[in-house]
């Protein structure tokens, strides 16, 4: 899988990707066009202590420029294959309602939760906030065995409203090397991983481009 992943990231405009989820299905029933099914398949099998592979300090741009400057950024490969390791949770555990930082939480789909906390200010503050959440979740990891992915967002309700919203928020507002954290994380022989859920900080950052929104006056002027 990693050989193919490197081929993908080294091919033309595919090199602009910053998140690559790659797996294999011996039954040939899995299709990447079935996004929900694809996420389910990978999240049932992935081992975040082993299956994350980062590319940091790259000089390769990404299409959304979520890094801190041009010709700088990072990438990550999620490579999972094998037997099912978990059945994905469909409801939020109670501990999502017992942390003062979390103002709202919701399920996006089985195995993926989103939490809303204060807006992002700077990375030092974000590190302290995420450390608070990591410690909170680490105290009850048995409740999170079937909830492998937690997204941190500015608007949890919007993010969980649809798969489209989840994809847009999570993967355009997250720089892998800066914004991925994990419960019970570790670094061993240059490899980073975590023994609990993966946490992705998908809040808007100060260096992000402003949202492109419709101008209501212009919209009315072109309405038939």
Q: Where do the protein language model's features map onto the residues?
A:
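Charged, compositionally biased interaction regions
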Residues: 1-224
